Swiss-Prot record:
Family matches, as PROSITE patterns: PCNA_1
Cysteines engaged in disulfide bonds, as pairs: none
Gene this protein is translated from: PCNA2
Keyword Mitochondrion: no
Subunit structure, as described in the record: Homotrimer. Interacts with the catalytic subunits of two DNA polymerase complexes: PolD1 in the delta complex and PolE1/DNApol-epsilon255 in the epsilon complex.
Organism: Drosophila melanogaster
Signal sequence annotation: none
GO CC entries: chromosome; cytoplasm; nucleus; PCNA complex
UniProt keyword DNA-binding, yes or no: yes
The protein's name in its UniProt record: Proliferating cell nuclear antigen 2
CDD domains, per database record: PCNA
Amino acid sequence: MLEARLSQTLLLKKIVDALKEIIAQGTLDCSENGLELQSMDNSHVSLVALSLASDCFEKFHCDRNVSLGLDLKSLGKVLKCANSDDAVTIKAVDRPEKITLSFESDGKERTADYELKLLNLDQDHMEIPKKDYTCFIQLPSSEFARICRDMSMFDESLTIACSSKGIRFLAKGDLGTANIQLSAGTAMDVSIEVQEPVTQSFAGRYLNTFTKATPLADRVKLYLSDERPLLVEYPIEDYGHIRYYLAPKVNDPDF
């Protein structure tokens, strides 16, 4: 049986909002250690991975591993029925066909219970190779969201180039060229670690969708290496993260 309680529904709303634009459905794997979800988008270009430790919850009990097939858009609709400061408790029995979400207002003056049917999803759990990246960038998540938004006005592709001089974002299109460069420093709160220079191009619409996770974290981490997917990580305080993996485009433009 699973029982997990959060003191505020807001966190769960933010997580679902960060997932549902990439994947419509996903399997939430529950264990005594917490919750995990991993799934690819329909185009098999991007992979999203959620990890949330049991310590994140006000109360957490899972006496047997259980997998919950979720329709994320439907879950998002149920969460809209709750105020952001309501407490939420998620319950599921062994071999469940549904989950129960119970919302309580502060002071328990209002309670509401909703049942959500589960899906029978046949999803393979992909093993992500644990290899070191040659470039690591950390910057404010709001700045990354702004860059992705601004670049999308110029072209559907966004080129990221990382070197010892800093990190550059470039988009070229019919409208013209957009070129933004960031250097490591305290004023912009940007940190950059480079072992080898990397230049890769990515589909801008995916990067823009990744920034739906901005409300979850003040800072975002970018990891790049040649011939490897880009890793965009949003830490969820000290309790976990959402990670997005995005395959680079085959032909990078001259930079």
